[in-house]
Amino acid sequence: MCLFMSNSSLPTKPNRKTRFGDRCLLMAKQQRTRLYILRRCVSMLLCWHDHSISD
């Protein structure tokens, strides 16, 4: 599942100049984006399922 794949855009070793708060904000933004995509996929599947039943 793509939710558990590692993000290759992030460096493997944290930059010492990057603050802990900045890393937390970045991780929170990524999680929020993943949840948004997941919600959209689920809603599309539910809508598709509703339309397929009526046929």
From Swiss-Prot:
It is a single-pass membrane protein. InterPro entries: DVL, DVL_RTFL_regulatory. Residues 19-50 are annotated as: Required for DVL/RTFL small polypeptide activity. It comes from the Eukaryota. It holds the Pfam family DVL. Coiled coil: none annotated. Belongs to the DVL/RTFL small polypeptides family. This is Small polypeptide DEVIL 10. It comes from Arabidopsis thaliana. The gene is DVL10.
